Amino acid sequence: MSGRSAVKHVPKPWGHETIWAHTDQYVGKILHIRAGEALSVQYHNVKDETVYLLSGELIYRVWENDVPTDVELKIGEAFRITPHTIHQMEAVTDCDILEVSTPHLEDVVRLTDRYGREGTSAP
């Protein structure tokens, strides 16, 4: 149905997410990651996502054949993560990131996590 969408604020140990769109077809979020913080090393079985850096400096770490590569995203650049790609975001400075994805929010397999959330999809 067309109209205003509910906006949800989700606190995270690394900052917060603002979910501004959540439908059965797609999800839109803004992630705020504090300087020096990082999301878990993770992958998704189904979820397909693309991020766009709105502000700050971000390292997007991506593993291919068990080898990590650091991609330094600059403001205005986008990066896509397809299912089964191991990845991690780390903020060099405070960052705001626009993320659009398929609606599979619980599809998170955390391999390592500095906040003790390995193996879960907990916020």
Model-derived regions: residue spans:
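Short beta-strand His + acidic residue motifs that chelate non-heme Fe in jelly-roll/DSBH
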Residues: 40-42, 60-61, 81, 86-92, ...
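A short glycine-rich, His/Asp/Glu-containing loop-to-beta-strand
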Residues: 5-42, 46-47
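Glycine- and acidic-residue-biased ligand/ion/polar-headgroup-sensing regions
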Residues: 46-64
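Short, surface-exposed secondary-structure edge patches
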Residues: 30, 50, 70-71
